[in-house]
A protein has these predicted regions:
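Mid-to-C-terminal secondary-structure elements
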Residues: 1-92, 290-483
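Generic structural signal for small/hydrophobic residues in well-ordered secondary structure
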Residues: 43, 71-77, 111-115, 129, ...
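Membrane-helix entry/capping segments
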Residues: 51-103, 121-124, 166-191, 222-235, ...
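Membrane-proximal juxtamembrane linkers immediately C-terminal to transmembrane helices
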Residues: 64, 256-276, 298, 348, ...
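Small-residue-rich transmembrane alpha-helices
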Residues: 70, 74, 148-213, 256, ...
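Alpha-helical transmembrane segments of integral membrane proteins
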Residues: 77-87, 115-142, 146, 150-153, ...
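Interfacial "coupling" helices/loops that link adjacent transmembrane helices in transporter permeases
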Residues: 108-150, 505-543, 597, 604-605
């Protein structure tokens, strides 16, 4: 053993025995090895009983709801790292990329099926001739399936090139560092080509191979699938645009929510606020912190300088349990604050007062006296949690039996943690000196750059051995928005790709259908129809399945977005404007896509159209 320092543990605990025996920390990870998965599951099942046995007397009648000791398989640790602001962020990015890829590929498969079945009439005579020459249906199915697989193989090679080219953009949008896995790519691509080719080619192969040779060769008009074929293509267009519109709605809601959480009321004004995480450096001692705070207060433009055991961007906090008569113990977040903490953050005071130097009883820095009582400030969620009906009713009341706390004030809220977590029940206690491992906060007026330079100069003069870090509240909170920002950007890329591919397919279908209806258009114009009438006819025909697609897209997007928004403590409402706006954009782009073919068909002269074969 190489031991740097040893400190003896006294046989007799200090005066604050409750702290000696009940102080704990959960911000650690223990690595365990089990012989197999069943042993790990059996061990995890014993954890609630373990907690009840060792901590039940301190955590109330249901301790497993207060404290949990979950097991995380090491293979999941990369996507679900335990603790910190990154929890769920990596998994969300992977799920987003997977959804974008799968849904975009689905739209591309539908495109192939639609266009292949639309072109079936042109290949009907080829199929009939091959059957006359002895080809049986299985041979034709293999041929058409092979054509689909070959086309997908070519698309896969093009996709590899596009992937290599677009990876920098995807990495920038998603905050990733992906590289193309050339070693794994060949087997994965082969599997994808076979699966996608099979899915895309199966229905067209069945449709093309079933044309009867005699009927096709005897007919002057090539078969086009009839009304059933048209209906099946319309259904596929509905699915295609339903997915694309749902994509667009989801992207709109994602962007709206990320903007909302950045602008939401956190209980303090972010402008004119500077956070100093450097004060929490382990090398910073109270004797050094006091003169630094005093010097910062004297700087021009500084309104107040405060400190607290947490600040914006700190998701973790100390936990305490308040024992209430006749009720389970209440687990609360406990924050230690120094002078001018509330003046710097300026939360809304609902009732009572906040800490000040005029009331000597506010100081709770001597924990040996906590058993005799201490003054605390609580936030709004604590009112009902402690059994009070209003802020005014809570002021002056004492809660807790073994460690009584007298409520002197109630503030509205101070949200420092992730927007995905609801406001925690929080108690604030006062330390007239500097709280341990304090986060500094400066409220100022004037130029942020001038204030930062002045604070930096003061810091270098008084604490040169400790790196200076000064951030805005938004910079500290950015870690909580990162995953959703990335998801919004990736979904935006996916929505654009989905709509683009869907419009390619729609353009192809419009081209095919207008070509088949040239004679019909000529007859209509001969009977008096104008070019505008022809355009309206064709646009309405293709717009109908897109309008119906909203019936698929809206419930799908609503359910998905409602589930996603439920994970936020403060979420936007699912306004109808998101759905109407996304659908309007999709319809507008689809109309532009169709319009080129419709205008070309409407300009055809009746004489040419009637002679057209």
């Amino acid at each position: 053993l190489h031991i740097s320092i040893l400190i003896p543990v006294p046989r007799r605990p200090p005066p604050a025995q409750w702290a000696w025996y009940k102080w704990g920390m959960v911000d650690v990870a223990t690595f365990l090895r089990f012989p197999d998965d069943q042993s790990a599951k059996a061990f995890a099942a014993k954890m609630p009983a373990f907690i009840r046995r060792h901590a039940g007397q301190d955590l109330g009648p249901e301790p497993a709801k207060v404290l949990s000791l979950p097991l995380l398989p090491i293979r999941q640790a990369h996507l679900q790292p335990p603790g910190g602001a990154e929890v769920g962020a990596r998994a969300l990015t992977v799920v987003t990329l997977g959804l974008v890829g799968i849904l975009t590929l689905l739209i591309a498969i539908i495109n192939y099926v639609n266009l292949a079945t639309a072109q079936a009439g042109r290949r009907a005579r080829e199929v009939a001739m091959r059957k006359v020459l002895g080809a049986h249906r299985a041979m034709l199915i293999r041929q058409f399936m092979g054509e689909a697989v070959s086309m997908v193989a070519v698309a896969a090679l093009i996709g590899m090139i596009l992937t290599e080219v677009s990876l920098p953009m995807i990495n920038a949008a998603g905050g990733l560092s992906l590289t193309f896995p050339y070693v794994l790519a060949p087997p994965i691509l082969v599997a994808l080509v076979v699966i996608v080719g099979g899915l895309a080619g199966f229905y067209p192969a069945i449709l093309l191979s079933r044309f009867p040779a005699a009927a096709v060769l005897a007919s002057a008009r090539a078969p086009g699938g009839g009304r059933a074929g048209t209906r099946s293509r319309e259904i596929l267009v509905v699915i295609q645009f339903g997915v694309a519109i749902a994509f667009m709605i989801a992207t709109t809601v994602l962007i709206a929510q990320t903007i909302h959480v950045r602008r939401s009321d956190l209980g303090f004004r972010r402008e004119g606020l500077m956070i100093l995480p450097s004060m929490a450096d382990k090398r910073m001692f109270p004797d050094q912190t006091r003169p630094i705070l005093a010097a910062l207060r004297r700087l021009p433009g500084v309104v107040s300088v405060g400190s607290g055991s947490a600040g914006p961007g700190d998701g973790d906090s100390n936990l305490d349990v308040i024992d209430l008569p006749g009720r389970p113990g209440l687990t609360v977040s406990n924050m230690i604050v120094g002078p001018d903490f509330f003046r710097s953050y300026a939360p809304k005071l609902l009732a009572g007062r906040v800490f000040d130097e005029a009331h000597g009883g506010d100081d709770a820095s001597d924990w040996t006296k906590w058993k005799d009582g201490r003054n605390v400030v609580i936030n709004r969620p604590a009112i009902s949690a402690l059994g009070f009906r209003s802020p005014a009713e809570a002021v002056g009341k004492t809660v807790g039996r073994t460690n009584p706390r007298t409520i002197i004030g109630v503030i509205d809220r101070l949200r420092f943690s992730s927007p995905r977590t609801p406001d925690a029940v929080t108690l604030y206690q006062y330390n007239r000196d500097v709280p341990p491992s304090a986060i500094g906060v400066i409220r100022y007026t004037g130029s942020p750059l001038d204030i930062r330079n002045a604070v930096h100069a003061t810091w270098l003069r008084m604490a040169p051995q400790i790196p200076f870090v000064a951030l805005t509240a938004d910079q500290r909170l950015a870690q909580y928005y990162k995953a959703d920002d990335q998801a919004a950007r990736l979904f935006g890329i996916g929505a654009a790709m989905a709509l683009l591919i869907a419009c390619f397919g729609l353009w192809g279908l419009a081209s095919f259908n207008t070509a088949r209806r040239v004679k019909e258009i000529g007859i209509r114009k001969t009977l008096g129809a104008s070019s505008a009438d022809i355009v309206r006819l064709l646009v309405h025909q293709f717009l109908r399945p897109i309008l119906i697609a909203n019936l698929l897209a809206w419930p799908l997007a609503y359910g998905a977005m409602r589930t996603w928004l439920a994970g936020f403590g403060d979420a936007v409402t699912l306004s109808p404007l998101y759905f109407i706006g996304a659908s309007g954009v999709a319809i507008f782009i689809a109309v532009l896509t169709i319009l080129s073919q419709a205008l070309r068909a409407s300009r055809a002269t009746p004489a040419w159209a009637l002679r057209h074969d």
